Every structure is written in C-alpha cells, then in structure tokens.
Amino acid sequence: MIVFDTGALVALERRKQRALHVWATARRDRTDVVVPGIVIAEWWRERSDAREKVLSSIVVEPVGDRLGRIAGEAIAATSGATVVDAVVMALAAQLGAVVFTSDVDDLEALRAFFPAVRVLAI
C-alpha cells in the first residue's frame, strides 16, 4: 500500500515523470494509492479534468478520532510538524504503507514518532 501526500498529488497532476511512474506501477500491480481526506482539502482548488482523473484513481480515507489523536501526539512530539504531514504519517503507520512525497525532509522529521514508516521522494 502507498500513501501520497499533497506534494505527490501535485506532482501527479503536473505529470511529473517519477509521480507518473509510481502511480502507473501501483495501478499495474493493483496496489492501492491512499490519501487522508485532509490532503484533498490542501490540494483541491477547483475542478479540472486532471484532478478528477487523479481523484478517481485513489482511495480517500477519512480522518477519524483515532487517527487525529495519533497525529496530534506526533505534532506534540515533533517540532515544526504540520497537521497534514502528521496525518499522512499516522495513516501510513496505521496501514503499514510507504509514503511518497515531494517534501522528504518534513516527513523524515516525523519518523522520530513513526519509525516504521518509509518516506520516499516522488
């Protein structure tokens, strides 16, 4: 399973080569690409065919109480962490997934709280 952050969705929408490769490989291998719902709020600005295509090919997970609490604890334990990044990492930890991001440094800082999560550049 793969989790994308906002930067990964932007890269996919802009048709960046690595993002397209990861996405196409996941689809070929029937691997779910998952994002927490809060990532959609950060990414979506208006409807476009490119965004609709991306959105139709991913799984959007709601941010419930449990995930929110874990993300909040990660924010408290990690200086400079954002809510969206913490939720992305918490979801990846919960799913046993790899995170693809354009902001490796930001998410690597959260690995102190989520040491089992692999963070890869998109």
Protein language model regions, located:
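Acidic, metal-associated active-site segment
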Residues: T82-V98
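Short, well-structured N-terminal submotif of metal-dependent ribonuclease cores
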Residues: M1-V35, E42-V59
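Short loop/helix-cap segments at secondary-structure boundaries that form the rim of catalytic
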Residues: E52-L55, L107-F114
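Short beta-strand scaffold positions
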Residues: V35, P62, V83, T101-S102
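Acidic catalytic patch
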Residues: V59-T78
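Alpha-helix capping/helix-boundary segments
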Residues: A8-L9, V39-I40, L67, V87-V88, ...
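Short hydrophobic/aromatic-enriched beta-strand-loop microsegments
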Residues: P115-I122
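Short, flexible helix/strand-to-coil boundary loops that buttress conserved ligand/catalytic motifs
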Residues: E13, R47, I75, R111-F114
